[in-house]
UniProtKB/Swiss-Prot annotation:
Family as reported in the entry's similarity comment: Belongs to the V-ATPase E subunit family.
SUPFAM superfamilies noted in UniProt: V-type ATPase subunit E-like (SSF160527)
UniProt superkingdom: Bacteria
Role this protein plays: Produces ATP from ADP in the presence of a proton gradient across the membrane.
GO terms for biological process, alphabetical: proton motive force-driven plasma membrane ATP synthesis
Protein name: V-type ATP synthase subunit E
Molecular functions (GO terms): ATP binding; proton-transporting ATP synthase activity, rotational mechanism; proton-transporting ATPase activity, rotational mechanism
Gene3D superfamilies per record: ATP synthase, E subunit, C-terminal, F1F0 ATP synthase subunit B, membrane domain
Keywords (A to Z) from UniProt: ATP synthesis, Hydrogen ion transport, Ion transport, Transport
Length: 185
């Protein structure tokens, strides 16, 4: 019977050893699974954080772009309004006493550009004034001319227009940054 007890005891010891190994192996598997799960969770968390940061950057960029577009639109509208006001004031200049001197300068500048002039064209409202200022050339009406003069070269095929509005148009590019800055203040 001692042999039975000895075999039983050895079998019980073997069972305990196998159980202990199984527990150790199960704990290792469990620890490894936890480690992989934690790594996967951390990886997903980093990915989500990266995506969140990218979404924030995109949202900020979109907002900045929208703000810039709104500012540009406001600036363009403001510039257009400024030029409308200036053009209105330029049209009013023709009714001021100083316009005689202004028209005389515009005529002189245009005639310098075309020394062989045939005629001077002005707005019908400026015809009498232009005839006082120009005595050596024909002075004709041209309703298309506003606030200035057109000097026609001999033969009538070419000419030069020198108007206040034309000068404003030529300076528009130079004035735009200054006007924008003033509107922004």
């Amino acid at each position: 019977m001692a042999l039975d007890k000895l075999l039983e005891h050895e079998a019980q010891a073997e069972i305990e050893r196998i159980r202990a190994e199984a527990r150790d192996r199960a704990q290792q598997i469990l620890a490894s699974a936890r480690e992989r799960a934690d790594a996967l969770l951390e990886s997903r968390r980093r990915l989500l954080e990266t995506q969140r940061q990218a979404a924030l950057v995109r949202a900020r960029s979109a907002a900045d772009l929208e703000l810039s577009a709104a500012r540009l639109t406001a600036s363009e509208q403001g510039m257009a309004e400024v030029y409308r006001l200036v053009e209105g004031h330029l049209r009013e200049i023709t009714g001021l006493p100083e316009y005689r001197e202004i028209l005389a300068r515009l005529i002189a500048e245009a005639r310098q550009a075309i020394p062989e002039a045939e005629a001077v064209e002005v707005n019908p409202a400026d015809l009498a004034l232009a005839r006082e200022l120009v005595t050596d050339l024909s002075v004709r009406e041209n309703p298309a001319i506003q606030g200035g003069v057109r000097v026609v070269a001999r033969g009538g095929k070419s000419g030069i227009t020198n108007t206040l509005a034309g000068r404003l148009d030529r300076l528009r590019g130079e004035l735009a940054p200054q006007v924008s800055r003033l509107l922004a203040e």
